[in-house]
């Protein structure tokens, strides 16, 4: 590996140590449906976001709620203390498309219609409201 590439990789590694995130991979829900849930909590304070997700009637909200709890636990693990009320917020949430399973549905006259069963990857980043202590 060249020196420039090595230095940029080290810088990325150091930047990741300052971020608090959780990833959920290969979720069997379409990215479009998952983005509806992600848009509900983007930029919200964590406790309020957990309340919104708990009472949402979307199927994807239970998965995002569990992922958000994991991101908060990751923050607590890195900082070696419990998160206080109103201290954390959802700084970023990304929903990216994952692999698609393709299936055939029988159609008239010997044809087959393609069914695309989509899946996605979700990444949640949490951060403190006041970044003075980091």
Curated annotation (Swiss-Prot):
This protein binds specifically to 23S rRNA; its binding is stimulated by other ribosomal proteins, e.g. L4, L17, and L20. It is important during the early stages of 50S assembly. It makes multiple contacts with different domains of the 23S rRNA in the assembled 50S subunit and ribosome. The globular domain of the protein is located near the polypeptide exit tunnel on the outside of the subunit, while an extended beta-hairpin is found that lines the wall of the exit tunnel in the center of the 70S ribosome. The keyword RNA-binding applies. InterPro entries: Ribosomal_uL22 (IPR001063), Ribosomal_uL22_bac/chlpt-type (IPR005727), Ribosomal_uL22_bac/org-type (IPR047867), Ribosomal_uL22_sf (IPR036394). Belongs to the universal ribosomal protein uL22 family. GO terms for biological process: translation. It comes from the Bacteria. It comes from Porphyromonas gingivalis (strain ATCC BAA-308 / W83). One of its GO terms (molecular function) is rRNA binding. Part of the 50S ribosomal subunit. This is Large ribosomal subunit protein uL22. It holds the Pfam family Ribosomal_L22. The lineage of its organism: Bacteria, Pseudomonadati, Bacteroidota, Bacteroidia, Bacteroidales.
């Amino acid at each position: 590996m060249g020196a420039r590439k090595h230095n940029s990789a080290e810088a990325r590694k150091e930047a990741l140590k300052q971020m608090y995130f959780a990833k959920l991979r290969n979720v069997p829900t379409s990215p479009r449906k998952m983005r509806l849930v992600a848009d509900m909590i983007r930029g919200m304070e964590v406790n309020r976001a957990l309340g919104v997700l708990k009472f949402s009637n979307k199927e994807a909200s239970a998965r995002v709620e569990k992922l958000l709890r994991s991101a908060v636990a990751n923050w607590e693990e890195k900082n070696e203390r419990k998160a206080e009320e109103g201290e954390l917020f959802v700084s970023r949430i990304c929903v990216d498309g994952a692999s698609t399973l393709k299936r055939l549905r029988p159609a008239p006259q010997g044809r087959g219609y393609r069914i695309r069963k989509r899946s996605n990857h979700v990444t949640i980043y949490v951060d403190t409201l006041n970044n003075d202590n980091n």
